[in-house]
A protein has these predicted regions:
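Short alpha-helical "packing" element that flanks the helix-turn-helix/winged-helix DNA-binding module
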Residues: 144-151
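DNA-contacting interfaces and partner/effector-binding or oligomerization modules
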Residues: 1-99, 103
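Regulatory/sensor and coupling segments of signal-transduction and defense proteins
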Residues: 106, 110, 138, 168
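DNA major-groove recognition helix of helix-turn-helix
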Residues: 175, 182
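Short, basic, alpha-helical segments at the C-terminal edge of helix-turn-helix-like DNA-binding modules
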Residues: 187-197
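Short alpha-helical "recognition helix" segments of helix-turn-helix
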Residues: 156-164, 171
Length: 197
C-alpha cells in the first residue's frame, strides 16, 4: 500500500491539487489485470493506493515524486507491503491493521526537510538512499524534471533533445544537473533490496 500526502497542504495554492489530480490520473493509467491498483482519497487530500503486486508501492512512489513539482509543498510518500491478498471485493472497505502503521510512519516525516519517503521498519540503507532521492526530487528545475522523466523511461539524450526542442549538449547538461543517473542507481538499489522484478 502507498499513501501520498501533500505537506503543509492547508497553505498550498489551488494548483497543488491540480498536480495531485494529474498524478492520480497517471497512476490510474498503470492499472491492469496483472497489476491491479485501487486509489481513493481518505482523510482529506491523502491519496490511498493499494497494489496487487508486492513492494510495487515504492516504485509508484518514485513515479509520483518524479511528476511532482519541486515546491514548498513536498509530496510525502509512505509505503508498506502486507502479507495479505489484494481485496477482490470493494477495496474501499479493506481495513488492514497496517494502514495505521503506514499513517504513523507518514506522520514521522510530515515536517521533515530531508526525507519524503517512509515505511514502517524501513531498513537503514534504504532510508539513507531515500533521503538522497528526496534531495534530488526537491532541487530539480522544471526543465531538469522533464529531462529526468524522459530519461527514467529509457529515452536517449538525443531523443530527449528532439522531444524538448533543445540541443543534445543542453540535455546532457540537464541530465547531469538533475542527478537522474544517481536516482537510477537509488532505484536499482531499492529494487535489489526489495527483490523486485
Amino acid at each position: 500500500m502507498l499513501i501520498l500526502d501533500v505537506s503543509n497542504s492547508s497553505k498550498a495554492p489551488p494548483e497543488i491539487y491540480n498536480h495531485l489530480s494529474y498524478i492520480e490520473r497517471k497512476l490510474r493509467s498503470l492499472n491492469s489485470d496483472e497489476n491491479k491498483l485501487y486509489m481513493n482519497y481518505r482523510i482529506g487530500e491523502e491519496l490511498f493506493i493499494l497494489s496487487s503486486q508486492p513492494h510495487y508501492s515504492i516504485l509508484l512512489a518514485f513515479y509520483a515524486k518524479s511528476l511532482w513539482p519541486a515546491s514548498d509543498f513536498p509530496l510525502k510518500c509512505s509505503f508498506h507491503t502486507v502479507d495479505d491478498s489484494y481485496p477482490e471485493y470493494n477495496p474501499d472497505r479493506w481495513n488492514h491493521p497496517s494502514i495505521n502503521a503506514v499513517r504513523e510512519s507518514l506522520q514521522t516525516i510530515k515536517k521533515s526537510k530531508v526525507q519524503d519517503f517512509s515505511s514502517p521498519d524501513m531498513p537503514k540503507g534504504i532510508d539513507i538512499a531515500l533521503m538522497y532521492a528526496t534531495d534530488i526530487f526537491r532541487t530539480v528545475t522544471p526543465l531538469q524534471q522533464e529531462v529526468m522523466q524522459y530519461y527514467l523511461t529509457g529515452i536517449t539524450q538525443k531523443e530527449i533533445a528532439k522531444l524538448t526542442n533543445r540541443s543534445v549538449s543542453t540535455i546532457s547538461k540537464h541530465v547531469h544537473a538533475s542527478r537522474v543517473k544517481q536516482l537510477t542507481e537509488i532505484i536499482d538499489y531499492v529494487i535489489e533490496q526489495y527483490e523486485l522484478d
